[in-house]
Amino acid sequence: MKLSRRTFLGQTSLATLLAGVPAWARAAAQQSVESAGQDAGGGIVNFAITPEPPVLVSFANTSGTSVTVSSKVVEGLLEYDRQLTPKPQLATAWEISADGLTYTFTLRPAVRWHDGEPFTAADVIFSLQAAKKYHPRGSATFANLEHIEAPDPLTVRLRLSRPAPYLILALAAGETPILPAHRYALDEALQNPLNSAPIGTGPYRFKEWVRGSHILYERNPDYWLEGHPKVETLIFRVMPDSAARLNGLKNRSIDIGSNSPIPLSEVPRLKEFPHLAVSTDGYEDNATITALEFNLERENLANPLVRQAIAHALNREQIKKIAFYGYADVTVAPISRRSFPNYHLDIADPYPYDVERANRLLDEAGHPRQAGGHRFALNLHSNPFNPGFVRTAAYVRSALSRIGIQVTLHEQDPGSYIRSVYTNREFDLTVSGVSTMFDPTVGLQRIYYSKSFNPAIPFSNANRYHNPEVDRLLEAAAVETDDGRRAEQFKAFQEIVVREIPTIALAQVHGVTVYNRRLSRFDETAAGTRGNLALLDIGNA
């Protein structure tokens, strides 16, 4: 068999990736990829992912890779453009009543599941019930959902007890996937084998998952969007090593990787490889702000003068440069400017970089320098999920040493980090990500709302912050249907937390996608590569 350069490189890369995988799995993986190459006639896209997802359907697991692989097979009612405006997917039209309590969706006709059965309103009803019961955010997102009905097979009506203005933004494939009701039972949904071999309505059909190696999807020839997808074979390659991902992109055996697939320090060197390009679009529904969070149960950190001093000691421009190599925007407020310009509070930093001021505030707070110049010591736990958080933590340690605060860094695996910070509350400071997600009520209420504090739930009010006015504003915004009034509520909330700083917002991180220039139309929605990639196109590079 004559091998093209692309096929040869792809197979060479696969052999490297499968070192340590059992022989039978290596053989199966090699055979499947060779077959895909023969059948596709060049219409193959290799997508690097890490870590390997635990499941391939995102209704009960919202890890980044689960969402990425799920949404190609299992779709949502809606998708969203980069301004977070709803667009049709499995629903072609929708109407929200004036009181915000009734949502009516018209479903796309003549859509079939990959097993040939018709898609109907029964699938939507089951899927929303499953999301409310099993999704990590489902009980909150659908808390006000009282009743679902189907007036006919292509109409679904939701009835709410109270308005939920964020609900219309929660219906993407990655957040609320629509599952085949005829293949699931609600009480056994988590154990269904289809979670690892999904059947959906999407542009790609599941073919195989060789654990530790790859997930292989093929084009759905019966997809409802005529002429799409154009890609014949989509292969998600599990590549935990960043050097391997970088080399794969360079040698063309990998076509694309998202969520900063290579060290950001390497991005400037990509100009040496003209077939590669970088995009920061397609992350608008999951904007992450790097933040320094305080444990307000610590006596010294409960003192606002100490928190103000720490804020004055931090140079956001340096963090942008050192921790994120420029792929970030400095910010003071916790709501993303890029994703929610109407909700973002554009405010001057009340605690600008000023080391002299920081030192004076610590003296005023009753923490004079002792022998050796030290005032007191703190521990700092860095969230391991993003290398930029770890680099930010190192910068914070250095910056605080200049004002006499001795910081001990704790770098841990994800499980240990969650136990130390959220379960056992052993931290003084933590550098982590605060995400507005697809709506501030969903993303930020868990961080700043006093009733969100729960040591059993990670990433929920680690500060143990309590401000009655903040609670009131967040509660009001959660049910406000007038967007202008809702914006005022969110801005008033930000005004308070920017001045009280239970958390110091530092920089909004840019998601980075590295891709072969032959690819296009993968970053046109707010979800980007986490969307269904139905429009993904292949040219030459």
Language model: regions and residue ranges:
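Extracellular/periplasmic solute-recognition and catalytic clefts
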Residues: 147-149, 207-218, 235-298, 317, ...
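Long beta-strand-rich cores associated with HINT superfamily self-processing modules
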Residues: 513-541
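Ligand/substrate-recognition segments at binding pockets and active sites
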Residues: 211, 258, 340, 363-437, ...
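Structural transition elements
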Residues: 330-365, 384-392
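Gly/Pro-rich hinge or "lid" segments in bacterial periplasmic/extracellular proteins
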Residues: 81-85, 172-229, 233, 356-360, ...
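Surface-exposed binding/hinge segments that line
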Residues: 106, 140-184
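Extracytoplasmic/peripheral linker and loop segments enriched in polar/acidic and small residues
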Residues: 305, 320, 406-418, 423-425, ...
